[in-house]
Amino acid sequence: MVNRFLRALFYWPIRITATCEPIPFEPLKHIKIDPNKQIVYIMVSSSVGNMLTVERLTKQLGWPSPFEDIVIGQKKLPRTAYLRDPTFFGSTGRARDISGTIFQWFAASREINEDLQIIPISVLWSRDPSIEGAAIRGIDLATPVWRKFLTLTFAGRDNCTIISDPCSAFYLEERLKSVGDYILRKIMLNRLVALHFLRKARTIVGRPFPNRSRLLHELVQRQGTQSAIAEAMEKDGKSKEELEKKAYEIFDIMVADTRYPLLRFFNTIISLIWKRIYHGQSIVGANKVRNLVQNGYEIIYIPCHRSHMDYILLLFAIFHEGLPIPQVASGDNLNFFPVGQIIRRCGSYFIRRKMKGDTFYTALFREYLSVLFERGYATEFFIEGGRSRTGRTLPPRTGMVSMTVQAQLRGIERPIAFIPTYLGYEHVMEVGSYMHELEGAAKKKESIKGLFGIFKRLRYYGRGYVTFGEPVIVPRFLNKHVPNWHDYIDPTGNSRPEWLYDTVNQLSHEIMIKLNDSASVNAINLCALAIIGDADHTLSINMLKRCLKLYLLVLSCDERRKGLMPSGSLDTIIAQALELKKFRVYDVGEDMKFVRPSRGQTLQLTYFQNNILHLVALPALIASVIIRNGHISRADVISHTRSLFYFLKHELFTPITEDELDSFINKYINVFVKGGYILDLDHNMLALSGDGYEELLILSNSIRLNLVRYLIAVTLLRQINDGTLTRKDFVTACVDLCKEVPSEVTNNSPEFADPIMFNIMCDTFVRHSYFSYSENGTIIPEHNKIVKLAQAAEPLLAAKLVRHLKTEIEKIKSHNVLGHEAAKAAQAEAAAKRTPEAEAISATDDKRPIISNDSAKTENKTHGAAISEDKIESSAAACEDKMQSVSEFLDDKDAKS
C-alpha cells in the first residue's frame, strides 16, 4: 500500500527529472530471455526512485513491473528482492535479508518444477569517477533520501540502469547446496549479491581521473624520465635543471586533463547530433570488453581510422555501453585553440606525429604510457596513424605497440589487452576531400575554420557501426611467440630484447587481422561492390539483387560474420543504400530499371567498396580462376588461388590463416556449386554454369586492379638485373607504370597508383623470398619464383594488357642507366608517341586456360555437361552490347537533366 502511494506521488517528478539509459545499450540484443520462464529481479535498494526508473525500463523491454507480485503455483510472492532499504541520513542504508525472498522463490519453483530467471538490476545516479584523492560517488549501496532528492533535482539525467545476464533459480540453488549450513548459505548469498553489484558499478564508473598537476610533477621525477635526462645531459651538455624544465613543458603539452562534467555535456551534445545525422547505430561485442575489465585487464582500444567522426562514434559507443572511458592519443595537429583545450578535458593527450630520432621525447612519452597502464586507465590510439583515404585498412604504425610491449616488460601486474575496434559508416563526410588528395591535391590543415565547415556538412549520413573485435592479449601472445619473455622483465623500462622488433611487427599484424575480422557489412558496401564491379557501372535492378544474393551467400560461409551483416530482404538492403543518394534508379521503360552512380559519386563508391574488399577477396580470386578457364579441376583451383592469395592477404589484411585457407577455398567453391554459379562434374572437375556467369564476373572484377598491380610488379621484376634497383626506385617505377595503364582498365581510380600498395607488396615479396636485399639496399630477385608467379597472374588478365605492360617496361628500362629524371623524360617522349589503339584495351577479353594437361584431358570428357567457352564469349559480348546501349541511353538522360 505504501509503495503504491509513493509510486503515484513520485511518478511524474521522476519521469521528468530522470532518464533510464540501459547498459547494455540495446538490452534485448544482449540479454537472452527465455519467454517460457517467469522473471524476478534483484535490486540494490528499495528506493522509489530506483523502482520507478526500473519500471520505466522494463515497460520498454516488455518485461513485468518490479512493483508487481509474482504468482508461482498457488503462492503469491514479491517479484523483487532488495539488498538494502534507504534511510533519510545513513550513507549505506538499512540492510535487508535478501536471502529470505530468494529462498521463497527456490521453494515455490521446486514445488511446480518450473525454473525462474533471476535478473540483477542496479541504478547508478552518477557515473562521475571524480579525481584522484576525492571521494568516489555513485557506487553507494543505498543512497540516502536527502542525497537522492538533490541528485534527482540536479543530475537525474546522468543515471544509468545496469542489467545483468539472467541466472537460473535452479542453478543458483544447486550452487548454494555445496555450502552445508543454512546460515552460511544466507550469509554467502547476501555477500555474493552485494559483491556482484559493487563490481558492476566499479566497472561502469571506472577509476578516478588523474590529478593533472600532481601527475606532471610525478612524471618528471620518475626513474625513466631521470634516466632520459641523464642521457641528454651527456649528449647535449645541458644542465639537469634545464632538461627537467624541458621535460615538464613536454609533459604539460602531452598529458590529458579529463573532466567528467565536460564529458557528460559533450555526450549530451553528441547524442543530439547523432540522432540528427545518423539513423541509429549498431554496437557489437561490448560484453567481451566488460568481461575483460571485470577480470582486471588493462584495456587499449585500437579503432580503424576513417574519419574525424571516429572520435564521436567511439565515445558514443563507450559511454552508452558503460565501458571504461579511455585516454585518447591525438596528433599535435589538433592542439589548437580552442579545440585543443576542449578535447584535452575530454580525455585526449597530444603527441607528435613523428617521433623518430628524438630519443628524449620518445622516452618521456613511453614513461607517460607506463603510468597510464600501471594505474589501470583505459587508453586508445589509431594504429594506422592517419585516416585512410582509400577506405582500406592502412599498414600499422608499430611505435605505440612497441611501447605497450615494453610497458608489459616492466612487470606491471595487469595484463594488457588490445581491443580491435571496427568503425563503419554508410557515409564519410571527408570522402570527397580524400578523392582530391589521392589525385594530388594538398591536404588541408586542421583549423577552427575547418571545424565550422564540418557543421555545414552535417546531414543524413545513414547508420554507424561499432564492433569490438576479439581481444589480443599481450602476455598470451608473448607466451606463444617468446615463451621465455618473463626473463626480460626490467622495472626500469630499459629492456630492449633482440626479439622485440620482430615480435612487435607480428603483434601489430595480428591486431590488423583482428580489426578487419570485426568489419561490419552494410548496404552501401554491398551495392558499391556490385556497381563498381560492372565495367560500365550500370546494373539492372534484377542483376543488382542477384549480385547481392551472391555476396550474402559468400559472406555467410564465415561464421564470424554472424551479426555483422545487414538483415532484411534484398529490396530492403537496396532501399537503405538508396537513402544515401550515391546512386540512382533509372526507369527506361518496359518495366526495365537500372542503377548507376549519381553524378560525381563513382570514385566515392570505390571507397565504400574497399571497406569490405578484404572479406570478398578470396572468393573473388576463386571466381577469377574459374572464369578464365571455363573448366578446371578443384585441385588446380586451390593451387592457383594459393599462389596469388598471399599477396591479397598481406595487402588487404584478410582474416584467413594459412591453416584455414584450403578449407575456405572449398567452402566458397561449394557455395558457388550450391547456388548454381558453377557445375561440379565428374573427376572433381568444375565448370562454369550459364546462369551465374555475370554475377561471378562482377565478383571477380572487385580484385582486378589488385591483380593488375601484382602483374606490374612481377613484370618489372622479371626485367631487372641483380643490384640495379633499390626498393624506393622499384616502387617509383611501379607507380609510373600504373599511370601508363589506360583509363579503360583503371576506371580513373586515383588509388590505383598508391605507393602504399607497392610498399606492402615489397614486404610480401621479401617475406615469401621472391626477392631479397643486397648490402647496399638493392633488390636481388629470385627469378624462378617470380616466373612461376607471373605464370599464375598473367592468365587472369587480358592478353593485350599484359603485352602493353611489357612494352611500357621496355621503354623505361633506361631508368637503370639514365637515372630517374632521365627515365621520366624518356617516358614522356614515349607517351607522346603512343597510338590511340594502345589506349583501347579491354579488361575482360582473351580467356586463356591456365589448367594443367591432366585437367585438359578430363575437360574433353566432360565438355558436353557444361557451358562451352564459345557460349561464354557470346554471352559476355551480348551482355556488354546490351549494357553499352543502356549506358548511352542513361548518359543522354543525365545530359538532358
What are these regions (language model features)?
Residues 1-897:
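Membrane-interfacial terminal anchoring regions of lipid-handling membrane enzymes
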